[in-house]
């Protein structure tokens, strides 16, 4: 987990209070990109050094964009892991507050320029997305997560077939 938003949120709020939409949006864009770039850098360090499963990897920027490396880094709240409440489990493991990150009631990370990911190093791993699920699958997920059906419908509304 990385954040580039610590301290930036108060500056962004100041810009907004002053009616400076341009600098507010610019700051948000810069901090978002910085967080994403740092997450990608750490993923590369994991592949090449920390876990060392691809020590000789030498990819161009183009190849990095095309995900030509081994392994994936899916993130909670994105198409492969749409249940943002999983961030609460991640928080129990990582204690996000140590780096100034907290969760909203819906499980979104604040500051918003914060990125998490789950490293999967298997050579055949690929990014994926959860498609539509039917009523039975939704009920099964609610049971497995110990959530009400209403909570799951809210969390996964884009994934539930009508």
Predicted regions: what is each one?
Residues 121-162:
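Charged substrate- and nucleic-acid-binding regions of tRNA-handling and nucleotidyl-transfer enzymes
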């Amino acid at each position: 987990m990385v954040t580039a938003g610590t301290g930036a949120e108060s500056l962004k709020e100041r810009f907004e209070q002053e009616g400076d939409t341009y600098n507010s949006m610019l700051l948000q864009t810069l901090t978002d990109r910085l967080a994403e770039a740092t997450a990608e850098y750490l993923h590369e360090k994991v592949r090449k050094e920390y876990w060392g499963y691809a020590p000789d990897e030498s990819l161009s920027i183009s190849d990095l964009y095309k995900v030509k490396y081994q392994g994936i880094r899916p993130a909670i709240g994105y198409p492969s892991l749409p249940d943002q409440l999983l961030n609460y489990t991640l928080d129990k493991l990582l204690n996000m507050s140590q780096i100034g990150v907290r969760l909203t009631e819906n499980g979104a990370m604040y500051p918003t320029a914060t990125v998490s990911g789950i490293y999967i190093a298997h050579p055949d791993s690929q990014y994926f997305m959860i498609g539509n699920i039917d009523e039975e699958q939704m009920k099964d997920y609610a049971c497995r997560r110990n959530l009400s059906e209403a909570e799951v419908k809210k969390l996964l509304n884009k994934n539930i077939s009508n």
